[in-house]
Amino acid sequence: MSGKSVSFYVSENIDVPLQIKILSLKGKKRQLRASEKLIDPQLSLTMSNVKIFSDMLVSVQVYDELTLGDVTVPVFAPYVPFRYGRNWDQWVTLPVSVRHLTPACKLRIVLWEFNGQRRIPFKTITTPIFKDLDFTLKRGIEAIKFTKQGKPSIETVKTLETINKYFYGDYAKKEWIDELVLKKLYKEYEKIDLPLDTFMLTIQFPVIELPIIYTEKPREDIQKNIPTLSNFDAASAFSVDHSTSNNTAVTSVDPKLKIPMGNKYNSTLKFYDPDQFNNDPIEEKFRKLERASKHNTSDKHVKPDAKKRDYLKKIIDYPPGKRLSAHEKGSIWKYRYYLQNNKKALTKLLQSTNLKDETERTEVLEMMDGWAEIDIDDALGLLGHKYRNLAVRTYAVNRLKKASDKELELYLLQLVQAVCFENLNTFSDTSNSKFTVVDFSSSSQMMKTRNTQRSESQNIMNSHIENNNPKFIHSIHSEDDSQIEELPVVISPLAEFLIRRALVNKRLGNYFYWYITSESYDQPFLNQILESFLSRLNSNDRNEIEKQVKLLTLLRNCCEEIKSLKDTVSKKKELLQTLLSTKVRPYLKKRLVKLPLDPDIVLNDVMIDQCNVFKSSLSPLMITFHTENGGVYPLMYKVGDDLRQDQLVVQIISLMNELLKNENVDLKLLPYTILATGLEEGAIQFIPNLTMADILNKYHGILPFFRAHHPDKDEELGVKSWVIDNFVKSCAGYCVITYLLGVGDRHLDNLLITEGGQFFHADFGYILGQDPKPFPPLMKLPPQIIEAFGGTDSSNYNKFRSYCFVAYSILRRNAGLILNLFELMKTSNIPDIRVDPEGSIMKVKERFNLDLTEEEATIHFQTLINDSVNALLPIVIDHLHNLAQYWRA
């Protein structure tokens, strides 16, 4: 044995939960001046603005940086009241064992403060669990320094380093003096003075005498006695039959014992290769040498034969998100010049390129300029989080410039999410490209213009955030005006493009503003983009947005006041009508307001007698507005519910509807509008309808409901033909779409039908295969719908199936676009995506069945319809749901 030895633990053997100790938070925030409190009293609700050591909560969570998925749920440290400083000194036990952690796992520590009745984030801090240098689990105390707007960084504090060395055992322990010295060291740390609005959080990892080194746990099904060439012997005393019937005998024998090869008729054995999933170093070296020459003229003239062309076509036709093997990447790279005229091949070339390698990156970026122009769906794919090279993203933005405003509106929600990837801190590779920097301070005249526009834009932001967005508050008020004016506004290429298009098209500008506003709760740096957009608007357009913000603030105040009233629905309705007549109506009488849900509609009054309060714990409001052209626009306004998931689903339905119409297939879909105007508030377009449950209770069937409104004795079913046509088409469209999106929790109370026969779904709280009920059907097709068709032998049922097949076929052809849009939403805070980003995209991809031919896909969908028609369990669950609703009432 060597004279020197190193002792350590391996993480795969540490089956204990991870613990983190929250010690203290140092630092002070600038307090509000008396004048600021008078100007905006709402700012005083944020406790840290008025109290130096305001109460705070701390939550700790483990997440995986590679998959962007959460490993654990957030765990809160016990509440501790503060007096002279923010000191917790509390251990938090996380529900994950050390052996399950990887170097990609990080801690997400969120400091929470109070804003009136709400809990809002003060700062989100991330820190690795393992050291980057040697992959050892962190030990001892760690200090994390941060500002409200800056990126947190681990601070080296000599006092804490000394304490850690004591914990590690580097100093000899003497009990009589250790306690005194430690107290003095802690006091010295407390004396550290930090600048105003600068903070330092100290946490402690468990102190273990020996370091814990990360090791990957081998697979559980690994063969224990691994066969090698040195221990095979055909003349072994063991027979193949004996080794097969008694595995224990084989795996527990002396290692020197020969393992039988078997007889000549059965000589095939399975080997375990521990390196089977690792990169082959020889192939890796070959790849580097092959691609090292920048001017490899031979590749420019290489052309594939017929067999190779088919192979390349197969690779190019892979759906977005599919990983390429090393051989597939090599083939794409070899024939890259041949593929330059194939617009679909560019994304596969980028997948096959190591953009971190300067030689490869330079060559590919040069080739992109001469590549065949890619489609918009491929351009969207290049804006995902996987592509961090700004030259690639700028190339995609240049392609988007050729898209029409109507197309951009369809993708705007995802494009705003893509802007979130372009935070300066997230890019490690900025070569061959740069950000567009909009610096208004370049001249005194520009500076003067900016000051005027900035003050107006901040008025809009202030009026909107007073009840909604506490993260805006600090970004506007935490620094002196002189400090703010010195900062340039840094805008990424995509954000700059969207701002310019939003300035030209007022409809795009309306949705851009509200999408950015709702996302800024999770991405504070979006405030900078929002401010840049507002500062460039002319005074009339800024005034329009300000009026919208004010109207929604009035509605929010009405909703919160009604929610606080603990009384009957009729009393709440009376209060609503009083509030609308005294607050909302006078506001609309003085000015015309463009509807945020649809800026083409202008509101001039509210129809108080047609407004109501829904029976729900959130007390959503039913508001009917009178429009400038003499029409009415009913909508539902909710506070306390995150509508961003519903907004996403309805946007995808609208997109699919447009894709179908582009193929001259109109399935009479009703993609009503949903707009999330904040983290937990928003508006929903209200379409007059009845739920299937109400129709069955009142009319005892769908056909009697149609006959009551559109009778026709000359028709076979006694209903006007256009009503049945609407019903059959819309049922087919929504069956296909809800199947593809994995919409769950379907019951007769969220299946809706209009008097004109249009069928549609509501309430998208469960998507992508999520469902609160056991054994949910892949497609919801109640027997009452089949009965309304005229039965399974009717012509309407055959039409329904044909429409389903056509819609499924068209949407499969556009699967790349839909999957790329979901890829852009992968890092969003949509609940059913956030729980498993990779898995959620995979579920959508699986339902497209892209590996099937057109005929096989049609047969697959026919089987789905047959299973749904004959399913009994959904009928039982519907009855149980109705029974539960009855007892709740």
Swiss-Prot record:
This is Phosphatidylinositol 3-kinase VPS34. It holds the Pfam family PI3K_C2. SMART domains: PI3K_C2, PI3Ka, PI3Kc. It is found in: Golgi apparatus, trans-Golgi network membrane; Endosome membrane. It comes from Candida glabrata (strain ATCC 2001 / BCRC 20586 / JCM 3761 / NBRC 0622 / NRRL Y-65 / CBS 138) (Yeast). GO terms for molecular function: 1-phosphatidylinositol-3-kinase activity; ATP binding; protein kinase activity. Belongs to the PI3/PI4-kinase family. Type III PI4K subfamily. Residues 742-750 are annotated as: Catalytic loop. Residues 613-619 are annotated as: G-loop. Residues 298-540 form the PIK helical domain. Autophosphorylated. CDD domains: C2_PI3K_class_III, PI3Ka_III, PI3Kc_III. It is a peripheral membrane protein. GO terms for biological process: ascospore-type prospore membrane formation; autophagosome assembly; cellular response to potassium ion starvation; endocytosis; intracellular iron ion homeostasis; iron ion transmembrane transport; pexophagy; phosphatidylinositol-mediated signaling. The keyword Nucleotide-binding applies. InterPro entries: ARM-type_fold, C2_domain_sf, Kinase-like_dom_sf, PI3/4_kinase_cat_dom, PI3/4_kinase_cat_sf, PI3/4_kinase_CS, PI3K-type_C2_dom, PI3K_accessory_dom. Multifunctional phosphatidylinositol 3-kinase that plays a role in signaling in modulation of host immune response, intracellular survival and virulence. Catalytic subunit of the autophagy-specific VPS34 PI3-kinase complex I essential to recruit the ATG8-phosphatidylinositol conjugate and the ATG12-ATG5 conjugate to the pre-autophagosomal structure. Also involved in endosome-to-Golgi retrograde transport as part of the VPS34 PI3-kinase complex II. The keyword Membrane applies. It catalyses: a 1,2-diacyl-sn-glycero-3-phospho-(1D-myo-inositol) + ATP = a 1,2-diacyl-sn-glycero-3-phospho-(1D-myo-inositol-3-phosphate) + ADP + H(+). Residues 761-782 are annotated as: Activation loop. Keywords: ATP-binding, Autophagy, Endosome, Golgi apparatus, Kinase, Membrane, Nucleotide-binding, Transferase. Its EC number is 2.7.1.137. Disruption phenotype: Leads to large vacuoles and defective respiratory growth. Blocks maturation of the phagosomes and renders cells hyperadherent to epithelial cells and susceptible to the antimicrobial arsenal of primary murine and cultured human macrophages, as well as to thermal, salt, oxidative, genotoxic, cell wall and cell membrane stresses. Displays defects in protein trafficking. Residues 607-873 form the PI3K/PI4K catalytic domain. Residues 34-184 form the C2 PI3K-type domain. Component of the autophagy-specific VPS34 PI3-kinase complex I composed of VPS15, VPS30, VPS34, ATG14 and ATG38; and of the VPS34 PI3-kinase complex II composed of VPS15, VPS30, VPS34 and VPS38.
